[in-house]
């Protein structure tokens, strides 16, 4: 059983060039009526306003990697980056972590062909119920729903969504950085409204039965092949491009050199790559993220009296 949800925050602009969340946050700041439900009204947060103004991912560092306990609790300094200062401002408003803030919905876009990806922390059964509700109620073959688990110890949580006791990030793509695609924008709007509907139904006593969830769990991150100078020597193969969440077998091509030579996947087992050729991950030296598909039992969810 879980207590009622009272404080919900919808976040856009955590990355300033991911335009679906930016546009929706700006719209709802002007007219929040769509965020009102019988049992609560969601707050709206434009997380990184300077990055939004400049239409860049971040100013000094990734805001979505700036919510560690160490950064949030450290003494302020003039040398602190803009994003660290902004993370502390958000923490001051909504913190401490996982206390009064019941649910965070953080809105993101990806250049990868990720459809509707729902990121949540492993063990957050409340968020899994919400994800299952979205998969059931928001069926769209153009943007199939996938659940991607963030499987790291709580003390290692650095994402903005970790401010909430429960949370999801909606990662929709493909969409180029700094660009608005109306199909992606409309899809995200539907998903946010359906998420708020779920939370309102829960508050009004709707019980959600147990189920078995299909999830993807991260195995490792794969970098591009690089030379001694650190330069990329081969790129995502055309047969892998846009194949997020599809099985990759040992021997399948993953990279191609400029001379046309293929580099094959030499792992020992089947994997499911995600964030394939994600533009923002070039600086992180990530060509794709390898995941495995798993099934987990999620117990029933009901309101705590």
UniProtKB/Swiss-Prot annotation:
Substrate binds at residues 57, 64-65, 171, 281. Belongs to the AspA/AstE family. Aspartoacylase subfamily. Plays an important role in deacetylating mercapturic acids in kidney proximal tubules. Zn(2+) binds at residues 15, 18, 108. GO terms for molecular function: aminoacylase activity; hydrolase activity, acting on ester bonds; metal ion binding. Gene3D superfamilies: 2.20.25.160, Zn peptidases. InterPro entries: AspA/AstE_fam, Aspartoacylase, AstE_AspA_cat, Aste_AspA_hybrid_dom. Keywords: Cell membrane, Cytoplasm, Hydrolase, Membrane, Metal-binding, Zinc. It is a peripheral membrane protein. It catalyses: an N-acyl-aromatic L-alpha-amino acid + H2O = an aromatic L-alpha-amino acid + a carboxylate; an N-acetyl-L-cysteine-S-conjugate + H2O = an S-substituted L-cysteine + acetate. It is found in: Apical cell membrane; Cytoplasm. Binds 1 zinc ion per subunit. This is N-acyl-aromatic-L-amino acid amidohydrolase (carboxylate-forming). Homotetramer. CDD domains: M14_ASPA.
